[in-house]
């Protein structure tokens, strides 16, 4: 469905992504790496918000730059630390985002109810965003990404700042979405994705280090029995370099 084919990106002559080749189909993909690994850069490229020097990004075999509106209709994105309009109610925020996505005005009330139900936010839609907890705000951002029934969902550090209960709640939301969507979740918190990811992608200083299912990756590293231990091994080695 979505293919990142030999993509490289530089900032001021410093390469931050190195010939990445990643294929995504249905299910949950975890993009793991510390700050500075290139996760947010890759997310911005997938949203067609950032140019790159080499390679291409394909959606169903076609370059995303050529598809334009068709690709955007298939894409839902919740960026890291997106601000909410505190004076808006949750309902008004989702309505505003639906208008930005060119959803038919007659369909918007029904669409707002649909996405709110998916993230268990219906009881709170009339409240102002300023009154929401961190977890509620994050669920609202997930809801706006679901507007228009996109096939591909991108989440950049979706659990940042959430308490353990809110993290678990959001994981349940992601699990419920994976049958009908492709999810790419960028995070440095391994516990957020270890039990739900169908595949894991490790990024290290802009390089693709490994990709595969959790069990498959552990088999490649005898003596390592958890994704968290594998993460620590990879990035402790990075600190020594």
What are these regions (language model features)?
Residues 47:
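Helix-to-loop junction immediately C-terminal to a conserved catalytic motif
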Residues 95, 99, 106-124:
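Conserved ABC ATPase "signature" region
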Residues 55-66, 70-71:
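Conserved ABC transporter NBD signature motif
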Residues 153-157:
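Catalytic Walker B motif of ABC-type/P-loop ATPase nucleotide-binding domains
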Residues 87, 128-132:
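Conserved ABC ATPase signature
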């Amino acid at each position: 469905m979505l293919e990142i084919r030999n993509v490289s990106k530089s900032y001021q002559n410093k390469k931050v992504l190195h010939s990445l080749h990643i294929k995504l189909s249905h299910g949950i993909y975890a993009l793991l790496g510390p700050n500075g690994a290139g996760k947010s850069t890759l997310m911005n490229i997938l949203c067609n918000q950032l140019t790159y020097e080499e390679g291409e990004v394909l959606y169903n075999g076609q370059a995303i730059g050529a598809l334009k509106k068709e690709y955007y209709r298939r894409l839902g994105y919740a960026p890291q630390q997106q601000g909410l309009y505190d004076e808006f109610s949750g309902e008004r925020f989702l309505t505003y985002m639906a208008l930005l996505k060119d959803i038919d005005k007659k369909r918007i009330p029904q669409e707002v109810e649909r996405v709110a139900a998916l993230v268990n936010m219906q009881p709170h839609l009339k409240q102002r965003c300023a009154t929401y907890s961190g977890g509620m705000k994050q669920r609202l951002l997930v809801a706006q990404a679901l507007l228009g029934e996109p096939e591909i969902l991108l989440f950049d550090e979706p659990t940042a700042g959430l308490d353990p209960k809110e993290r678990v709640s959001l994981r349940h939301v992601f699990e419920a979405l994976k049958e009908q969507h492709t999810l790419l979740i960028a995070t440095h918190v391994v516990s957020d994705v270890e039990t739900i990811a169908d595949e894991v992608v490790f990024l290290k200083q802009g390089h693709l280090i490994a990709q595969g299912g959790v069990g498959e990756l552990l088999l490649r590293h005898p003596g390592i029995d958890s994704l968290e231990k594998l993460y620590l091994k990879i990035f402790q080695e990075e600190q020594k370099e």
